Structures are given as structure tokens and as C-alpha cells.
């Protein structure tokens, strides 16, 4: 789903919106910062931060893991999606590699379904450092995805390693 990477390009031609401020996460061992608008109701999680678009059609989360924990992280991501009724169509899987703010950004995308109907699903793996990665989990209703993509791009563009 190149639509997951497209927000980064869209960001370059869009204006800035009001952000809630910068979230540094995880709280106990900061590894990254990201800005999420207030109306996305950002909340901290055990390993990061998450938010939902105002129309509840798009979910995005950022979690931190050690590079050697990648297999467990991916298992946890799929367990989370399953717990939330999100099912990916394996035949629709697409992978891509790009750069985001100078960091390697690998995405795996699928089409799928949730309790409300068709969705787009994305998992992004961003290399913050040799030891730490950020995992971006994304799912969006196909009905509202295009409307929320510009904001997703702006959120992604704020992701940086913590100083």
C-alpha cells in the first residue's frame, strides 16, 4: 500500500496543523518523539503512543522495541490487530522501503477487514538507531482513509529519535 508512504510526500505540499505537542516515548526510557493533534486524542501505551482520527476511521500507534526483539514485536502487532477484529488478506501483502526523516522506513501493507468493513492495514519499521526501532501500526477504514492521509503524513513527518 503505497498510500502508507504517500502521506510523507503529501506533507511536503501541505500546511502545518495545530499539534498537541511533542510526545517523547516510552516514558521510562525515551527513544523517540512524535507530534499528534489534540483531536486525535493521543494516549500513552506501555511502549509508545497511539491516536485515532476524529472520525474514528484511522488508528495509528508508535511503539519502541530493541532491534533483536523484532519477531516478538511483529507477533504482538498481529495479536493486537486480531484482538481488535482486524483481519489482513495475506494475498494483498505489499512491502516497500523508503526513508523517513533520514531514517530507514520499511512498510508492510495489506487490505483487510474489521467489524465495520474494508480497511487498509500497515506496519512500519523505522530504524531510530542501531539498537532501537519504532513500530508504526496503522489501520484505516477505506471509506475515510483518503480524508485522513494528509494528517497521517504530518504525524509521520514529526517522528524523530529522542535527544
Q: What is the role of each PLM region?
A:
Residues 16-20:
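Sec/Tat signal peptide C-region and signal peptidase I cleavage site
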Residues 29-78:
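Secretory pathway targeting signatures of secreted, lumenal, and periplasmic proteins
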Residues 29-30, 67-70, 119, 145-152:
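Solvent-exposed, acidic/flexible segments
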Residues 38-40, 134-163:
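Surface-exposed amphipathic alpha-helical segments
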Residues 44, 81-88, 156-163:
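Sec/Tat-exported extracytoplasmic proteins
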Residues 61, 107, 135-137:
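Structural recognition of the beta-strand scaffold that forms the well-ordered cores
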Residues 82-129:
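Signature of long, low-cysteine stretches enriched in small and polar/charged residues
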